[in-house]
Regions:
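Active-site histidine-anchored catalytic micro-motif
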Residues: 28-84, 88, 104, 129-247, ...
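Conformational coupling and interaction surfaces
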Residues: 29-30, 50-59, 220-227, 231, ...
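Short, hinge-like loop/turn segments at secondary-structure boundaries
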Residues: 79-82, 110-112, 256-257
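Surface-exposed loop and adjacent secondary-structure segments within mature catalytic domains
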Residues: 91-142, 146
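Secondary-structure junction/capping motif
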Residues: 100, 150-158, 264-274
Length: 362
């Protein structure tokens, strides 16, 4: 009897230790992520960030802001406010590089589009003046004082430091222009083998571009930075481009459903005043896409990927008709180009379910 009790107690202790070990292992398995983004309110960079902040399997180390959809001061303000709304002010927002690599890039855009043609009239931050400061944007937009501030550090240094502190563990999710990451690997090339993987939202390999007939917006705005990145010998590169993103339409009924799911009044207000809501009200048949959210979703759950190809990739940085075009090579690739996984199809019903689930937690 005594022996049986001792054995029982030993087994209970062993089970308890196993449970603790399992919990610790689960915590250790969290994917460490740096989100590098040209932040906007809600769709789609904002939703991508908030999903990562809520995902139980993601450890979002920080959000680095880059030029692109918005100016860096704007992106900084939007990032801070949205993390406040989802109670994740522990995640640092880190302002990054304010201009593309090419000198006077924004000044060339008007003539470039006259000479080479356009797809979409949208040019992001290139279409209006840079705000004075992130705080000015925040106060003007939200009419209140922020509860936190951006990290007093440059985004490039943040990327370098966090990668070195977590060798082989950090995934970079680059959903804006690539100038922060490109600069980081040029300044500190020793971090390249230490990065677990890079996932990009950018490029269009097997279909037309959106900003020009050949180029997707993120890589068109800073082709030089995109080229540096995709030619860097990272352990793994995954590209979520227009090839997959523009198969997944975002329409008025779904936008309204998601708006109704959101609980936080701050986020709900952003959804209601967002340009997309205005566009859907003016043009109910309008179709939009959720580019960056797809990239974040396949990071959270890679089983969402249904079809992909592996190719050597490059970016055309020659100023001309195909400036910023993403290029894929099955063989006979240019010297220096690197292999990448190009995502072509995702499980759309499951992905929408995931988006709606996370939005209901905002």
């Amino acid at each position: 009897m005594k022996t049986t009790r001792i054995l029982t107690l030993c087994l209970m202790a062993l089970v308890g230790l196993t449970g603790l070990t399992t919990e610790r292992a689960a915590a250790q398995k969290k994917e460490k992520v740096i989100l590098d983004t040209d932040m906007v309110e809600v769709f789609d960079d904002g939703v991508a960030m908030m999903m990562l902040a809520k995902a139980p399997n993601i450890d979002l180390l920080g959000v680095t802001i880059v030029i692109g959809n918005t100016w860096v001061p704007e992106g900084t303000a939007y990032g801070i406010r949205q993390l406040e709304c989802v109670n994740r002010t522990d995640i640092p927002i880190v302002p990054g590089i304010r201009q593309p690599i090419y000198p006077n890039r924004f000044e060339t855009i008007k003539n470039e589009r006259i000479l080479f043609g356009i797809g979409d009239a949208y040019v992001g931050a290139a279409g209006y003046p840079e705000p004075a400061s992130w705080r000015a944007v925040y106060l003007q937009k939200y009419g209140r004082e922020p509860s936190t501030e951006p990290l007093d550090m440059k985004a490039v240094n943040f990327i370098i430091d966090r990668v070195k502190a977590n060798p082989g563990e950090v995934t970079i999710l680059a959903i804006g222009t690539c100038v922060n990451l490109a600069t980081a690997v040029r300044i500190a090339p020793e971090i390249v083998p230490l990065i677990k993987r890079v996932i990009y939202m950018g490029g269009s390999f097997f279909r037309p571009g959106n900003t020009t007939p050949t180029a997707e917006f993120n890589w068109w705005l800073d082709p030089e930075a995109a080229k540096i990145c995709v030619r860097t010998p990272f352990k793994e590169q995954v590209i979520v481009g227009l090839d997959v993103c523009e198969k997944m339409a975002f329409r008025k009924d779904r936008y309204e459903r998601i708006t109704n799911l959101v609980r936080n009044e701050g986020i709900k207000g952003m959804m209601k005043r967002n340009y997309l809501n205005v566009k859907f009200l003016e043009e109910p048949t309008y179709t939009h896409y959720v580019w960056d959210v797809i990239a974040a979703s396949i990071l959270i759950d890679p089983t969402l990927i249904r079809e992909e190809v592996k190719r050597y990739v490059d970016v055309n940085s020659q100023f001309g008709f195909s400036y910023g075009q993403a290029l894929a090579f099955d063989s006979n690739q240019p010297v220096g180009s690197q292999p990448a996984r190009i995502i072509l199809t995702v499980d759309e019903p499951r992905l929408w379910s995931m988006i709606e689930k996370y939005c209901s937690e905002f």
